[in-house]
Amino acid sequence: MKLQKPKGTQDILPQESAKWQYVEDFARKTFRKYNYGEIRTPIFEHYEVISRSVGDTTDIVTKEMYDFYDKGDRHITLRPEGTAPVVRSYVENKLFAPEVQKPVKVYYMGSMFRYERPQAGRLREFHQIGAECFGSSNPATDVEMIAMAAQFFKDIGITNVSLELNSLGNPESRAAYRQALIDYLTPLKASLSADSQRRLEENPLRVLDSKEPEDKAAVEGAPSILDYLDEESSAYFAAVRSMLETLQIPYVINTNMVRGLDYYNHTIFEFTTEVAGSQLTICAGGRYDGLVAYFGGPETPGVGFGMGLERLLLVLDKQGVELPIETALDVYVAVLGADANGRALELVQALRAQGFAAERDYLDRKLKAQFKSADNFKAKTLITLGESEVESGRVTVKNNHNREEITVSLDQIQENYQLIFEKLGF
C-alpha cells in the first residue's frame, strides 16, 4: 500500500506555510486592535456539543460530521465549526461570572473537519479564523464585528469585497416568518429538490439558500423576512444599518440569506469577493443570543464570524496580492575542511544568539555548491570559514548582493555582528 495523505487533506510545506503564518499574524494584529484575546479549544468535542447547537437537521450534522465512539464508548466528533466549541468553553469556564470583564471578546484559529466533496478552497480538513463576542446586545457590537472583518480585508489587500446583510429577527419574528414560508412553499413542494422537500418539514428557512436551480426558481416569489420583523427586530436591524452607514461600510440586503446553522437570530452577514468571474464567500457570521443559555449558561447575547483560511489564501493568490514575506537568511557560513567544522557551528550559534537568521553547510560540499545554496537561501551576507581562517582568527564577510567585502576577526563577529552587517549596507 502506498502511504499517502487522506483524501481532502493537504501538506502545507515551508514555502507555503510562510504565507499561512503571515495571514494568521495579520489577523492577530487586527484582533488585538479590537481588544480580542485568543482562545484554544479541543479539536474534538462531545457529539452533542455540535449536534444540539448547530442543529440536528443541518447538513453538517446529518451528512458531514466526522464522529466516532472512543474506547470509553463516548460519542465524539471532530469539530466542524468554531462557534459551538467556544460557547461550550465560555459556559464551562464560567466566563459569564460578574468578575470577568464584559463583553468577553475572543478569537480562534485552527483545523475544522467536514466530510464533504473536496473543492478549491474547501477541503475535509480546513482551517478557520473566527471571532466571538459575548455579553452585549448593543447593535453597535454587530457593527464592530462587521467593521473588524472589513478592516482586515482592506488592510491585507483583498479587493472587490461586498457585504450582504439580513435579519432573522427575534424568536417571535422568526416563528411568524417560518409559518409564512411553509404556507408559501407547501403548494410548490413537488417542484422542490429532494433535500428541500425534507427541509420544508424540518427547517424551511434552509430552502432559501439552496443552490439547486428548481429551488431558486421556487423561492423567487417567497415572502421577505423583513415583512415579518416585529417592532423590536425592525428597530434593531435599522440601528445596525444606520451605524454601518455612519462608518461608510456599504452593504446590500439579501433577504434569502439565512446561514447554514440554526443558532442565529437578528443580524446575519456574509462578505463575498469576485475571483475569476465568480462570487466567493470569504467570511460569514451573525448574532446568536440563545446559544449560551442552550449550553446551560445564563441568558447571554453573542455575535461572531468565521473565515476560511484556505479560501483567503486562494483569493489573495488569484487577486495577485503579494504578501511581504521575509524568507532571506542574514548570514550563510560556507565551511571548508574538517578542521573548520566545530568552529563553524560555534559561529552560527553565536550569530543566532545575536538575533540573526544563520545557516551553514553540513554536507562537506565544494565551495561553488555552497555559494549556490547561499544564493538559494537569499543570504544577505556570506562568510567563508576554512582551516586558514580558523588558524588566523580572521575571515572575509561578503555582501552577497553587491559582492562588497570586509575582513574582520572571528571575535568581532561573535561579539557584535550588527556593526559588520551595517558596514555592508544592511
Swiss-Prot record:
It is an enzyme of class 6 (ligase). The keyword Cytoplasm applies. GO terms for biological process: histidyl-tRNA aminoacylation. It catalyses: tRNA(His) + L-histidine + ATP = L-histidyl-tRNA(His) + AMP + diphosphate + H(+). The keyword Membrane does not apply. It comes from the Bacteria. SUPFAM superfamilies: Class II aaRS ABD-related, Class II aaRS and biotin synthetases. Signal peptide: none annotated. One of its GO terms (cellular component) is cytoplasm. GO terms for molecular function: ATP binding; catalytic activity, acting on a protein; histidine-tRNA ligase activity; transferase activity. Keywords: Aminoacyl-tRNA synthetase, ATP-binding, Cytoplasm, Ligase, Nucleotide-binding, Protein biosynthesis. It is found in: Cytoplasm. Pfam families: HGTP_anticodon, tRNA-synt_His. Its EC number is 6.1.1.21. Gene3D superfamilies: Anticodon-binding domain, Bira Bifunctional Protein, Domain 2. PANTHER family: HISTIDINE--TRNA LIGASE, MITOCHONDRIAL-RELATED, HISTIDYL-TRNA SYNTHETASE. Belongs to the class-II aminoacyl-tRNA synthetase family. Homodimer. This is Histidine--tRNA ligase. It comes from Streptococcus sanguinis (strain SK36).
